[in-house]
């Protein structure tokens, strides 16, 4: 699942891993609202990890909306993000496959926002997407090819989100 910590919303791709009952229990205990949807890759296979297709930060959400095939669910995700003031940066399946959904916003020692993404994710973005993201925060783009090719995850997967 991907958490909007500011607005206490938990976004989750419905699959065997993020079980609806467990998600609802998590949300109830921590005061979050769930947004559950089905998402698939370009080949139609289920997306198990929401952070493959979505990043939600303070002001920006990076989302592969085309992976949410059901129009009502896609509209619900989009409405939820927009209603909380997020600017949506839509990514394509190709960008998602280059880990562009696997980003994480952190803050540096001075409290300034930084967006961590792999070099592959960064290179998959358009010039306009990069310029927009850079206008909002500092981008940190390490080369994680070894991790991405051998482990299957990327930048967000490497950072423990205990904060």
Task: Outline where the language-model segments fall.
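The feature marks the mature, well-folded catalytic cores of soluble enzymes
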Residues: 1-163
């Amino acid at each position: 699942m991907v958490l909007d910590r500011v607005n206490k919303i938990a976004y989750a791709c419905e699959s065997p891993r993020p079980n609806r009952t467990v998600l609802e229990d998590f949300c109830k205990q921590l005061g979050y609202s769930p947004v559950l949807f089905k998402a698939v890759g370009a080949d139609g296979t289920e997306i198990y990890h929401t952070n493959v297709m979505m990043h939600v930060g303070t002001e920006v959400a990076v989302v592969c909306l085309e992976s949410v095939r059901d129009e009502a669910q896609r509209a619900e995700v989009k409405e939820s993000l927009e209603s909380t003031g997020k600017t949506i940066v839509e990514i394509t399946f190709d960008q998602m496959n280059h880990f562009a959904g696997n980003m994480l916003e952190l803050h540096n020692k001075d409290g300034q926002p930084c967006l961590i993404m792999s070099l592959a994710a960064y290179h998959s973005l358009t010039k306009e997407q990069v310029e927009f993201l850079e206008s909002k925060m500092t981008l940190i783009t390490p080369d994680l090819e070894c991790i991405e090719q051998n482990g299957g995850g990327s930048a967000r997967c490497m950072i423990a989100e205990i904060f």
